[in-house]
Amino acid sequence: MSLKSIAKQALSLMDLTTLNDNDTDEKVVTLCQQGNTLFGTPAAVCVYPRFIPIARKTLKAQGAEQVKIATVTNFPHGNDDIDIAVAETKAAVAYGADEVDVVFPYRALIAGNEQVGFELVKQCKAVCSANNVALKVIIESGELKTAELIRKASEISIKAGADFIKTSTGKVPVNATLESAHIMLETIRDLGVADSVGFKAAGGVKTTEEAEQYLALTAEILGQDWINQAHFRFGASSLLANLLATLNDEQVNQNVTGY
């Protein structure tokens, strides 16, 4: 595939994201407008729950209702209070989210507690299932660090009902890496759940060339045909400008953020 073809594919697989403490309605409106490109739209926009209504209104106004709205819960710290995670997930669904990205209680897993992660994901999944909302589970691979823990968090999340497993919050020093993606994609393959579970690389994917590496890795493990909006996403914000530059034959200036 040409770099332009890859850029266009990556754009269609993006969860175009703003998760900053200084987010405003205006910034979310701008994000939604930026995603409405001459080369198509992203799979989703990802915003804090309180911005779901303005995102919905903006997407509708620009005729981009096919773009899903994702949000985050138990974010970003991945605490182990199941009741709070479930309450936040219920609130996100009530705001109108199409997809919820919940943070797995990764510190509890590092400390040896596998059960709380399973229960938290299972209960959040029950809320989502009842409302036809997809659940993505952020395992925070850069904090888990070891292949063993990354695989374990992926397995627990999948067995508890995750629709996607996602690398990172974008709020820690190490976010998506090809190494962690490799382990997560192999876990999806090895558990035989490729039909029902997807993968999301989030944080740190900033260029068309980097996106290409993730797409190539995924194709190698799960096949080219597996790569579609139902199975694969990039969680990103600064990636969009680079993809558009590739598509427009322009040079791009890198703006550096965690996402």
Curated annotation (Swiss-Prot):
The EC number on file is 4.1.2.4
Q: Name one GO cellular component term.
A: cytoplasm
Q: Which Pfam families match?
A: DeoC
Checking SMART domains in the record gives: DeoC
Pathway assignment: Carbohydrate degradation; 2-deoxy-D-ribose 1-phosphate degradation; D-glyceraldehyde 3-phosphate and acetaldehyde from 2-deoxy-alpha-D-ribose 1-phosphate: step 2/2
Record's family? Belongs to the DeoC/FbaB aldolase family. DeoC type 2 subfamily.
| NCBIfam families in the cross-refs | deoC (TIGR00126)
Its name, as the record gives it, is Deoxyribose-phosphate aldolase
State the organism of origin: Glaesserella parasuis serovar 5 (strain SH0165) (Haemophilus parasuis)
Its lineage reads: Bacteria, Pseudomonadati, Pseudomonadota, Gammaproteobacteria, Pasteurellales
